[in-house]
């Protein structure tokens, strides 16, 4: 079974450490949908280390319209999350 993690606050120190821990020994089909807000460069090293397994999204979760767009993008371009982690 493949796992898809949706992690909000993924650009935080805890978020980045969690992504690294999740993907270190994970099967290649494990996917992390990583939400940040204006600071996605913090995920660049993880995207490089785990190519194709980290998909960053720049979304301001305090803006309802942006959240709606984010949900639509996820629904059309990613598998449904099996896990949701809000940091």
Predicted regions located by residue number:
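Extreme N-terminal starter segment of soluble prokaryotic enzymes
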Residues: 2-4
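Conserved Rossmann-like nucleotide-binding pocket used by diverse enzymes
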Residues: 6, 33, 57
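Rossmann-fold scaffold of SDR-type NAD(P)-dependent oxidoreductases
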Residues: 8, 81-87
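N-terminal Rossmann NAD(P)H-binding glycine-rich loop of SDR-like oxidoreductase domains
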Residues: 11, 15-20
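Short, well-ordered alpha-helices that flank and scaffold nucleotide-derived cofactor binding pockets
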Residues: 20-24, 72
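Conserved glycine-rich Rossmann-like NAD(P)H-binding loop of the short-chain dehydrogenase/reductase
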Residues: 23-43
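Rossmann-fold cofactor-recognition segment
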Residues: 47-65
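Conserved Rossmann-fold cofactor-binding substructure of NAD(P)-dependent oxidoreductases
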Residues: 62-77
